Amino acid sequence: MKFSIIALALAVAFVCVAESRSEEEGYDVSEEIQAEELEEAERGGIDRKLMEVVNNLRKVQGREDSEEAGRGGINRKLMEMVNNLRKVQGREDSEEAGRGGINRKLMEMVNNLRKVQGREDSEEAGRGGINRKLMEMVNNLRKVQGREDSEEAGRGGINRKLMEMVNNLRKVQGREDTEEARGLKDKFKSMGEKLKQYIQTWKAKFG
């Protein structure tokens, strides 16, 4: 209680001294107070602006340490890429995995050709596959050429396709001109002749 009374008395004395001093020196204490308030207001405006900038940085960067955040994001992206490569290639050594995958794919293609052409029942499979291919070619020729010039186009297209098939068989079987290949080629030629006769008969009937 005594302390509060003493503090109040000191405050009253300070105000009285300040007023008497302002009267003697010719300036108003209120002006000094206004200047201090203006300075505080300016500082408050600057503080608000700084807080806005800080908040914007936090929103954009997602945290206060933007450099670390950037590095962390890049590292995460790199790890995702590495993991994706590992998943696709099935192992860390991508070069070996690539070569192994290509070799497996080539072996699958060779095995599929063997099964179709096939060293299991190559004659029947060959005849069935060739007949289907020839019928598809005939149907395509009819649709594309409109039945106007089927004989010449049929001979040229069929001969090219037959030669491609013969060449593919030669490459897969590892020889260029064996008795089997010659016999198969003769079969292809005879089938081509039959197809030619069929086309001529069809043209004679339907024009």
Swiss-Prot record:
PTM notes: Cleavage of the propeptide depends on the processing quadruplet motif (PQM) (XXXR, with at least one of X being E) and the inverted PQM (RXXX, with at least one of X being E).
Signal peptide positions on this chain: 1-22
Motif Inverted processing quadruplet motif 2 per UniProt: ranges: 91-94
Motif Inverted processing quadruplet motif 1 positions after renumbering to this chain: 63-66
Known tissue expression: Expressed by the venom gland.
GO molecular function: toxin activity
Cellular component per GO, a single term: extracellular region
Keywords: Amidation, Antibiotic, Antimicrobial, Fungicide, Repeat, Secreted, Signal, Toxin
Motif Inverted processing quadruplet motif 3 per record, residues: 119-122
UniProt short sequence motif Processing quadruplet motif 6, positions renumbered to this chain: 179-182
Motif Inverted processing quadruplet motif 5 in this chain: 175-178
Motif (Processing quadruplet motif 1): 40-43
Motif (Processing quadruplet motif 3): 96-99
Motif (Processing quadruplet motif 5): 152-155
Extent of motif Processing quadruplet motif 4: 124-127
Domain of life: Eukaryota
Renumbered ranges of motif Processing quadruplet motif 2: 68-71
Localization: Secreted
Its biological purpose: M-zodatoxin-Lt4a: Has antimicrobial activity against Gram-positive bacteria (A.globiformis VKM Ac-1112 (MIC=0.3 uM), and B.subtilis VKM B-501 (MIC=1.1 uM)), Gram-negative bacteria (E.coli DH5-alpha (MIC=4.5 uM), E.coli MH1 (MIC=3.2 uM), and P.aeruginosa PAO1 (MIC>35 uM)), and yeasts (P.pastoris GS115 (MIC=36 uM), and S.cerevisiae Y190 (MIC=18 uM)). Does not have hemolytic activity against rabbit erythrocytes. Causes paralysis, but is not lethal when injected into insect (M.domestica) larvae.
Protein name: M-zodatoxin-Lt4a
